[in-house]
Amino acid sequence: MEAHSGMEPSAAMREYLAEIYRLQEDSPTVSTTSLADRLNVSPPAIPRMLKRLQSVGYVKHVPYQGVELTELGREEALREIRRHRILEVFLVSVMGFTWDEAHEHADDLSPGLNNRLTERMAEMAGQPTRCPHGEPIPDRDGRLPVVNDVCV
């Protein structure tokens, strides 16, 4: 595995990392089929992107065994999840969109957000700790708060 180049990942790379993170919540290793389904892309497109992600140190991919995030990939995935969830809060609390509208618009808009814009939106939205759907928002350092929610 090569060291991280210091280059910012593309929007597509960030999207893959965030989806791998979400899928790893259910299983430590993510299949390329489940990743293709989740991203709504053709299965042959997955290995090409995984090769790019592995070359900069974001993932470990073993063909036919699956993919998992490295620590660097996990950090980047959490930054992307932060962007998306802050954008959702901003769209609801500042712009007046409904939760479902906010999610749809956030899917379209979050790839274009940089950290500076994300932090400004967080400030305008009152430094939220949860998205409109109740999910925790990672902090600026990519740490998720400990959640002690109880299902009722």
What are these regions (language model features)?
Residues 54-62:
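A short, conserved structural fragment
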